[in-house]
Amino acid sequence: MKERLYPIEKIRNIGIVAHIDAGKTTTTERILFYTGTKHKLGNVDEGTTETDWMEQEKERGITITSAATSAFWKDHRINIIDTPGHVDFTVEVERSLRVLDGAIAVFDAQVGVEPQSETVWRQADRYRVPRIAFMNKMDKIGANFFNAIQTMKDKLGANPIALQVPIGSEAEFEGVVDLLTMEALYWTDENGQIIEKRSIPSNLIDFCESKREDLIAAVAEVDENIMELYIEEEEIPVDKLKEAIRTSTIQSKIVPVLCGSAFKNKGVQPLLDAVIDYLPSPLDMPPVKAFDGTTGEFVKDILPFEDGDFFALAFKIMADPFIGKLTFARVYSGTLNKGSYVVNTTKNKTERVSRLVFLHADKREEVDYIRAGDIVGLIGLKDTSTGDTLSDKECNLVLEKLEFPEPVISVSIEPETKDDEAKLGKALNALTEEDPSLRSYVDHDTGETILSGMGELHLEIIIDRIKREYKVNVKVGQPRVAYKETIKLPSEAEGKYIRQTGGRGQYGHVKLRVEPLPLNSEKEFEFVDKIVGGVIPREYIPAIENGVKESMQDGVLLGYPMVAIRVEVFDGSYHEVDSSEMAFKIAASMAFKDAIKKAKPVLLEPVMKVDVTTPEEYMGDIIADLSSRRGRIESFENVGGTNTRVVHAQVPLSELFGYATIMRSLSQGRATSSIQFSHYEEVPEQVTQKLLSRE
């Protein structure tokens, strides 16, 4: 077997996650610069960053897709996935976290934890991703390292441990004190490549000694070996302390915190050291679980050994203008050579991988083989989708699936010419394959093509890509809300479908009971067979369930999909000769529609979690405006010692179209907002009446 350049214990698969403006992409850029991966510093404001390579990202200065990039530091290979911080793109974050081993959470040292940081943090908790934190923007007015750390405790319930003390802050920020070695590090040149080690400034010695005490006490709380030395008041060797920090970080017991200013080129090299020292290699992570593809039951653990069977998870698909379809995959075990065949065990299809590439934003490096621990691009797969499992042998094993949220907002799009029509279909196929939170379908009533996604910005960027990348001219309709329907009361009804038209007839007779299920729970539908004594033969029960499921796609009020309903089939009858699956399916559909009409059907609307960050003087106007949009104000908070306030509210999506523009005008462009889906709730009666009267 070929020697691998970087043994698996020297690989780090990490993500960089943060709120939209915490400086995450700049931090990634500096990492690439100091690791020698790129030779010139990139800046987001100038559109010269390496990882923001889509046109829309360069224009908007926000990261939309997770760009995969490799960097090399102190004999280690670091595979970095730069993830978007905007809530409309949480699907990108979700699928990146699924395949990562560790993450750097970047925060703005002036404000600490912001709304989107909470969302991303919870996602990382769900996938048990070990983290280190970087308090960025220490040069910013109002930056306060220890206040920002406190917000991690208060808002995230995290256990952050400061490994450094900043030397100065705001314009006076010069460097950091390393609390493990008790050395002061100063960045003395403009590009931040020269680091001088000096003794700690005299005015900081006492403070740093007390903070080092805090650090040791905090590590002792989570590590028995350090606790023993601590109790005996023995000197704790730095390497032992590092080892304990590493173990506790990998077990997610602590979050080591560092600080710096990526934009001013200070603090990035110690962050890279921390990635190597404290974040896990693929060997440190719990094994990935494989399940039976049919029953969903756990079968075995997949261990990260190169000589095992090949298993990988496709976590992202991209349409590349030069090579066609590119599949990003995380290899969990085994080895694969280019030109090999793989089995897509999710779809039970065999495909050939023609080429293998390591990715560097939109550049690629071709390789002959890939191994356990790699994050890689596969070229040549035509039928593989996001979330599919790939193996080198036929088996019925699949890795844990990726879950994606339902879209909440839609627009109609229509091609301007006949020529555009064919191109639009192709564009939509490619884009929906690339982004599982995007759906497109044809509305049978109107014949319109509908595009659905996670928010206004999400759809705006997709439409921009349709026009720019796929050269399709489209007209776009007004945004629409993805309403749903449900019921409030239990009821019963029967459906009889009898047809006699010469020869064999049709006969199906069903009695159903419906009742509401709790809203916003994981169960959106429950079907229960309560037939006794064979009044309806077993073989017709699936047809009854299908009849109900199909009817649920088209609610009785406004034709929206129905959710949160339990259906029980409890009686009926059949005919020896004339009964068929078709007849029972139709009878079930009739009974269901009838039962729903008697069960007090209601409309449901998506409600969004809205967080507005605004200077205090505009707070009154912002609150009044949110209230006028049927918003419920939940709380306010101050942003660490500044006159900035954050308003937290719940507002129906239907009231938020164009909100960003209104909010900017209310605050003279100084407020920012974060809007993300929260839950569905019942539409008030007067609003329902308005919607019904429009139909």
From Swiss-Prot:
The disulfides recorded in the entry are none
Q: Which residues does the record give as GTP binding sites?
A: 18-25, 82-86, 136-139
In this chain the tr-type G domain maps to 9-283
Principal location class: cytoplasm
Q: Does the keyword rRNA-binding apply?
A: no
Q: In its UniProt record, which GO terms are filed under biological process?
A: ribosome disassembly
Q: Which Pfam families match?
A: EF-G_D2, EFG_C, EFG_III, EFG_IV, GTP_EFTU
Instruction: Give a GO molecular function annotation for the protein.
Output: GTP binding
Q: Which SMART domains match?
A: EFG_C (SM00838), EFG_IV (SM00889)
Q: Which family does it belong to?
A: Belongs to the TRAFAC class translation factor GTPase superfamily. Classic translation factor GTPase family. EF-G/EF-2 subfamily.
| Job description of the protein | Catalyzes the GTP-dependent ribosomal translocation step during translation elongation. During this step, the ribosome changes from the pre-translocational (PRE) to the post-translocational (POST) state as the newly formed A-site-bound peptidyl-tRNA and P-site-bound deacylated tRNA move to the P and E sites, respectively. Catalyzes the coordinated movement of the two tRNA molecules, the mRNA and conformational changes in the ribosome.
The name this protein carries in UniProt is Elongation factor G
